[in-house]
Amino acid sequence: MCIRDRPPARSIGEDVGGLYEIWNTEATPFTTKGFEDKADIDIELEPSKGGTKFRYFQINPTPEGVPVEILNEMAADAFDKIKASHCRVDVSKHPAMHKTDSIDYIILLKGDVTLILDEDEIDLKPFDTVVQRGTNHAWRNNGNEPALFIAVLIDSEIDA
């Protein structure tokens, strides 16, 4: 049964990229009854305790010539809007570095992207898959067009 056949009810941050919520679960076990849009809630980066998030997201190319201080302010504002300021634990390698208490399954659908980690950088091409296990990371769009990803985030207890 198809519950919804339309664009996502909520999105945020289109000026720097954007998060587009497809579906959320709040905790397990979850009910399969009802027809309400589980993604029609305020957008937060992390899933709730015991919950999941299914979304696609877009990373726009970094504007040329913008000072790093301004990029840091833009990133801080973007993370604040999605209740994720606490996820920015070490931004020394990139203004959008962040770490969530989740395991994330991510597929790059379109674009030329580098995954930036604390100790490494990995170039990705369309249909490459990344499994994030509570790692501090950021995405750098190396192209001239927005990069598009699809992701499933699952709340997890991350080892320190």
What are these regions (language model features)?
Residues 7-60:
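Short, well-structured hydrophobic secondary-structure segments
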Residues 52, 121, 125, 134-158:
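Ligand-binding loop in jelly-roll beta-barrel domains
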Residues 53-100, 134-136:
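Conserved short histidine dyad/triad with adjacent acidic residue
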Residues 92-126:
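A short beta-strand-loop-beta hairpin characteristic of the jelly-roll/cupin
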